């Protein structure tokens, strides 16, 4: 794994978060390099600067290294991005007091002179981010957005024009391009919230823009809902909760239980919390955490059931370390006799991991694509 970042005279040591000793994934990509290279070569840096979708701090650490006194507004939806950026600033002896942190639902300052941004995978989320920028950026503000060259086309430039202002793309470098957008100073309204019904469970659901499954149950959640475990559960964790539909259903089935919703996405946690209220569930029974798996779950929480639909992507990277961490955290935090109940794609072979960790694994249900697995802490 490469940890030495070197671009246009900026030298840093960068790690992904959480650190993985045996991973070949690094904490930055060529789009980070291209964006920083473009910024330095243009000699048009400006303060204050916003940095958006910076996976593990490559951009914010680089800008801080160039000028430690620059005020930076760092916006992220991912808790691991927040923690990784913080970790890498410390690793490189860079100050943190010049950073101001924002989630993707917070309002950025109106005096921004420059925005540096990575293109997210979710284009609905990207449109949301551009719309929020349109509400605060004065006309003429530059926004530089880096992405893989194959992701940039005329349709994407039209998204800029619709939500923020005219844009043009650079030549390709290392299979990436940098888009330069100039804010037109015209604020746009945010998209209206969409609420949809899950009639078979008497639930109403809505998602914020960066939450998986925009307006219907995804297939994995559906098969999980059809195969929830039976028991006398008092403390349940919906780990990687998304919009919270699994936890909402368990709240209906086990009304005496405390339900703990955890996700790396702040928008997911906010969606789950809103859906809890929307479905008129008891306020004192729902608990919500923006966290890296169960890293900061209060010690007094000892679940007897953990529900989990593990992601196998972290940003653009395909990785199984998130699932592995979820399973490790579940084994660590479950009560003796407690159950981990998961859904996953069949080809991911999660049964091997569960057998290794728990020394037992049962197949509860399966179809052509998904499998429901259960392991018990003994």
Curated annotation (Swiss-Prot):
Keywords: Cytoplasm, Methyltransferase, rRNA processing, S-adenosyl-L-methionine, Transferase. It is an enzyme of class 2 (transferase). GO terms for cellular component: cytoplasm. It catalyses: guanosine(1835) in 23S rRNA + S-adenosyl-L-methionine = N(2)-methylguanosine(1835) in 23S rRNA + S-adenosyl-L-homocysteine + H(+). InterPro entries: DNA_methylase_N6_adenine_CS (IPR002052), rRNA_m2G-MeTrfase_RlmG (IPR017237), RsmC/RlmG (IPR046977), SAM-dependent_MTases_sf (IPR029063), Small_mtfrase_dom (IPR007848). Its EC number is 2.1.1.174. Its main location: cytoplasm. SUPFAM superfamilies: S-adenosyl-L-methionine-dependent methyltransferases (SSF53335). It comes from the Bacteria. It holds the Pfam family MTS. GO terms for molecular function: 23S rRNA (guanine(1835)-N(2))-methyltransferase activity; nucleic acid binding. It is found in: Cytoplasm. Belongs to the methyltransferase superfamily. RlmG family. Specifically methylates the guanine in position 1835 (m2G1835) of 23S rRNA. This is Ribosomal RNA large subunit methyltransferase G. It comes from Shewanella baltica (strain OS155 / ATCC BAA-1091).
